[in-house]
Amino acid sequence: MAAPKARALGPEEKDECMKIFDIFDRNAENIAPVSDTMDMLTKLGQTYTKRETEAIMKEARGPKGDKKNLGPEEWLVLCSKWVRQDDEEEILRAFKVFDANGDGVIDFDEFKFIMQKVGEEPLTDAEVEEAMKEADEDGNGVIDIPEFMDLIKKSKNALKEA
């Protein structure tokens, strides 16, 4: 498994991450020992190889960071990676459900089925076709996994802004 990329955390996500950090900040010194990282990862349901963990830790600490301890900022960098990974796994599971024939793409009929189920009112074929054109970034007539992830992320962002 490749180390996930970081993403910005919302206020609630930051609060949750810091609650976990506080558990590992045993002496209330605003630090958590790096040696506990594997334990932290396991308790959070994350499974990385030792090499992946070292790469994540190196990125979180930065070039001049403390090699033995993590501060709150470094912890939030780590947390942002896990949150993004969970989001992507959830989107991938949804994609597999919507890809009814399992061919790795969502075609017009599968997309129409999705749009009919999530919309409040039934859409016409023309409306579905227009929505599909917007989601189909490369114009090949189907929606692949990266396009589906972009579609979901855009939808989430639109809902947050509304």
Curated annotation (Swiss-Prot):
PROSITE patterns: EF_HAND_1, EF_HAND_2. This is Calcium vector protein. InterPro entries: CALM/Myosin/TropC-like (IPR050230), EF-hand-dom_pair (IPR011992), EF_Hand_1_Ca_BS (IPR018247), EF_hand_dom (IPR002048). Residues 12-47, 49-84, 86-121, 123-158 form the EF-hand domain. Ca(2+) 1 binds at D99, N101, D103, E110. SUPFAM superfamilies: EF-hand. GO terms for cellular component: cytoplasm. Keywords: Acetylation, Calcium, Cytoplasm, Metal-binding, Methylation, Muscle protein, Repeat. It is found in: Cytoplasm. GO terms for molecular function: calcium ion binding. Ca(2+) 2 binds at D136, D138, N140, E147. CDD domains: EFh. The modification N6,N6,N6-trimethyllysine is found at K96, K117. PANTHER family: CALMODULIN LIKE 3, MYOSIN LIGHT CHAIN 1, 3. It comes from the Eukaryota. Transmembrane segments: none annotated. Its main location: cytoplasm. The modification N-acetylalanine is found at A2. The exact function of this protein is not yet known. It interacts with CAVPT, a protein also of unknown function, in a calcium-dependent way. This protein binds two calcium ions. It holds the Pfam family EF-hand_7. SMART domains: EFh.
